[in-house]
C-alpha cells in the first residue's frame, strides 16, 4: 500500500492565541529543573499554605472515607452539611446572613468560580473590569471566553483602592462584571466598610455585577469583613471565598460563592454542565473545619507574623520598601530607584541566591516596580533565604 505523504497537523483553537501559559506554571518548571540539578531553590513564590488543616478536619476526612456509601456522585449544589457550614461561618465571622439552600454554591476551589461566573454573565464581546495589579486569571479566563478586558488602576498613592473618579468617567455601557479582590492580592491592601459601600453604590448605578474575591480575610487581619455585609449587596454582588488560604487546604480544592438566589441558579446552570460534586468525605471534613475557634486561626497568624518579620528583613536587604499594615499571606515591596528592572532583580536572586521571588509585573503594569514574597514557607527556610540574599554582590 502506498504511503500517504500528507502530514497530519492539527491547529489549536484560536482562543489560545489570546493567552500564554500561566507564569507560575512556567516558572515552577524552571525551579524544578534547578532543583533536579541539585541547586536547592527556596521558593517564596506561590501562596500555598504549608501548615496543615486542623486535626479534627483530617480525622473527619479519614473516618468518613471508610463509609462504603460515600463514594458515589454527590449533589451539584454541595451536600447540606457543607452549605449550612458555610452559612454559619459567614454569620459568625462576617455578620452576614445567607440562606444555605439558595444563596451559597460550593466550588471545586474558587478559581473555577471565575470560569463559571464569566460564562453565566458575560457574552463574547462584552466587557469586564479587572484590577491592575490583580490576579492574572481574571484577565486570562475573560480573554479565553471572548470578553473584552478593561483594566482599572490600583495605585500605591491611593492605597491600592479603586479610583472612583476615573471609573465614573469611563464608558461602562458594555461592562457586565467588575472583579475586586480584598483583602487585596498582591498588594496586601485591606478592605474597609466604606470601600464596600462605594462599590455597591457604583454597581447599582452602573448596572454592573461586582465579584469580590475574598480568600485572605483571616490572615494577619484583625477584623474579617465581607462585601455582602453592605445592605442590598446581594442584589448586585457575588463573593468568592476559599478554604485554601483560611483553613490550610489548598490541595483539597474547596471554595464557595454567595449571592442572591437568582444569580446562584444561573451559575449552577453552568457548573452542573461542567463538573460534579466533590467527594462526600471531603465536604464533611470541610464543614468540620469551618467550626474552628478563634484560637485556631490565631495559631496560624502567630506563625505568619514571625514569617512576615523575616520577609520584611529580606525586603530591606534588597533595598525594597513596604507598607507594614499589609494583610494576607504575602509581602509586597517596592524595588529601589537604583534598580532598573524588577525581573532583572528577581532573576539575579533566583540564579545567584537560589531564592524564587515573584516579580510584580505578572500582576499588571502597576506592579512593574514591585516584588511579592510568599509567607507560605517555614521560618528556617525564610531565614536561610535571607542569609543567601545577604551574600549577593
List the model feature ranges, each with a label.
Residues 2, 150, 168, 348-358, ...:
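PLP-dependent enzyme catalytic core of the Aspartate aminotransferase-like
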Residues 2-109, 116, 290-292, 393:
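N-terminal small-domain helix-loop-helix segment of the aminotransferase-like
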Residues 120-142:
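Conserved PLP-anchoring active-site segment centered on the Schiff-base-forming lysine
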Residues 37, 145, 205-206, 318, ...:
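Helix C-cap/helix->beta junction micro-motif
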Residues 4, 232-305, 309-315, 392-393:
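Conserved core segment of the aminotransferase class I/II
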Residues 287, 303-312, 322-334, 367:
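Conserved glycine-rich beta-strand-loop-beta hairpin in the small C-terminal domain of fold type I
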Residues 126, 147, 205-209, 233-235:
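A short helix->loop->beta-strand "cap" motif at the edges of active sites that frequently abuts
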Residues 150, 154-225:
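Active-site phosphate-binding strand-loop segment of PLP-dependent enzymes
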Amino acid at each position: 500500500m502506498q504511503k500517504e505523504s500528507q502530514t497530519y497537523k492539527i491547529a489549536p483553537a484560536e482562543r489560545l492565541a489570546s493567552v500564554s501559559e500561566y507564569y507560575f506554571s512556567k516558572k515552577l518548571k524552571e525551579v524544578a529543573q534547578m532543583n533536579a540539578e541539585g541547586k536547592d531553590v527556596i521558593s517564596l513564590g506561590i501562596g500555598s499554605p504549608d501548615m496543615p488543616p486542623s486535626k479534627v478536619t483530617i480525622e473527619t476526612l479519614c473516618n468518613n472515607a471508610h463509609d462504603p456509601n460515600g463514594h458515589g456522585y454527590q449533589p451539584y449544589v454541595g451536600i447540606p452539611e457543607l452549605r449550612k457550614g458555610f452559612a454559619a461561618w459567614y454569620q459568625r465571622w462576617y455578620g452576614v446572613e445567607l440562606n444555605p439552600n439558595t444563596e451559597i454554591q460550593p466550588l471545586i476551589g474558587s478559581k473555577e468560580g471565575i470560569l463559571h461566573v464569566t460564562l453565566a454573565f458575560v457574552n463574547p464581546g462584552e466587557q469586564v473590569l479587572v484590577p491592575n495589579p490583580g490576579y492574572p486569571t481574571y484577565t486570562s479566563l475573560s480573554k479565553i471566553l471572548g470578553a473584552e478586558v478593561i483594566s482599572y488602576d490600583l495605585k500605591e498613592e491611593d492605597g491600592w483602592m479603586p479610583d472612583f473618579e476615573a471609573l465614573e468617567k469611563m464608558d461602562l455601557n458594555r461592562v457586565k462584571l467588575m472583579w475586586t479582590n480584598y483583602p487585596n492580592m498582591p498588594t496586601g491592601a485591606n478592605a474597609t466598610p466604606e470601600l464596600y459601600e462605594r462599590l455597591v453604590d457604583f454597581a447599582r448605578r452602573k448596572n454592573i455585577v461586582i465579584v469580590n474575591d475574598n480568600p485572605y480575610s483571616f490572615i494577619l487581619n484583625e477584623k474579617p469583613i465581607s462585601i455582602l455585609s453592605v445592605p442590598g449587596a446581594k442584589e448586585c454582588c457575588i463573593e468568592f471565598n476559599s478554604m485554601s488560604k483560611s483553613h490550610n487546604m489548598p490541595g483539597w480544592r474547596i471554595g464557595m460563592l454567595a449571592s442572591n438566589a437568582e444569580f446562584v441558579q444561573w451559575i449552577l446552570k453552568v457548573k452542573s454542565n461542567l463538573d460534579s460534586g466533590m467527594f462526600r468525605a471531603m465536604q464533611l471534613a470541610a464543614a468540620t473545619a469551618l467550626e474552628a475557634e478563634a484560637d485556631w486561626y490565631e495559631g496560624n497568624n502567630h506563625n505568619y507574623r514571625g514569617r512576615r518579620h523575616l520577609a520584611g528583613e529580606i525586603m530591606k536587604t534588597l533595598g525594597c520598601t513596604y507598607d507594614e499594615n499589609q494583610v494576607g499571606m504575602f509581602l509586597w515591596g517596592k524595588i529601589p530607584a537604583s534598580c532598573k528592572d524588577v525581573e532583572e532583580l528577581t532573576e539575579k536572586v533566583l540564579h545567584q541566591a537560589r531564592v524564587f521571588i515573584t516579580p510584580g509585573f505578572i500582576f499588571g503594569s502597576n506592579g512593574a516596580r514591585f516584588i511579592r514574597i510568599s509567607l507560605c514557607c517555614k521560618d528556617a527556610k525564610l531565614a536561610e533565604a535571607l542569609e543567601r540574599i545577604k551574600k549577593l554582590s
